[in-house]
Amino acid sequence: MSNSAPDSDGETITTYELLERSAESALELQREDGSFPPGRNYTYDEPETPVRTTSHWTMTLSEVYDITGKEKFQEAADAAVDYLLGDEIRPHGYTYYCRDASGKDHCNGLVGQAYPIRALAHAGLILERQDAIGIAEEVFTIHPFDEELGLWERVEIDGKKLSFDRTLNHQILFAAGSSKLASESNIVADRITTFLDRLPSNMELHSDGLIKHYARPSPIDAVKAVIRRPRHWPLLLNEMVFHYYSRSAERRKKEIGYQPVNLKGLAQLRMQFPEHGVWSNNKIRTALEAFDVDECSDIDYGSITPGMSFALAEYAFSADTGRIAPLIEMDLKGQLDHTTYLLTSDTVSDFDQSSTISILVELPDHDVCVGS
């Protein structure tokens, strides 16, 4: 990964101070029902419900309360948790209602569910909200898990099973988002362990370490899964398009954008499952070591905070902590509003962009230059 960093001139604060200042401004954004204004899917420009933004801010508000002990952040975090536990966004009592895009599921695959599970698990532990932890585990276990393939299925908001989510970063983020529940649930711990056991066989790389977009279990395993349950026929489609996408320049561009997303998820899993043998696997090491963060800076796919995502990977996998601050600063340069201390963007909804500061919750305190 590169050592890209902005100029060193300007104010230096700690990441904890940055989180608190950002959370202070977020209090003005929070609505009466505890939710935060929804953004738009920044890859496909599709309308979203408040689930994603509220989940991110729930993480930040609860963490800032844990850091500062200030009651106003506790109250705001509790209100956000209450919203995530409400019937409006789980209208049928199954999965979260995340988007309303023509021709697509409302659950937004596994990734749509990963964010509220992550938020409820994190905030539930800090706020001592067992109801939050219980719903997070409930939503996790609603998703069927194939022990042989090591993959989860999507479940629509009405409970309909939609077969496997074939997008690898969705599988990784669902496991990562649920990983904080592992200490609370043997079911969660066992399924994520199996997912990690199978990950090398489901993940394919380009020769330079770039992770390919789709999960790719072996053809034999895919055929067996379809025989067991015919609804899994899309797995066979993966195999049909695999070689075409391997040569597609547009697909490679997309995969570059999602590299920090994948590595962020792997970092979150490493922090919760540090002793698992997958971390010494050659595919994982190659993906971590072979890619340059600068390649992601002008890509309109994947992560909108690639520097912070790579910083989390550096923290989880590298002994060199000196690169963490410069990577964070890469995202702050040009994005941080120095009045509100919210992240902004010219190309992405500010509601989405500002909420992604929650990535810093998972890092220890660091001094960062925020410019002037």
For the regions a language model picked out, list residue spans one by one.
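Glycan-recognition and catalytic cores of secretory/periplasmic carbohydrate-active enzymes
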Residues: 1-372
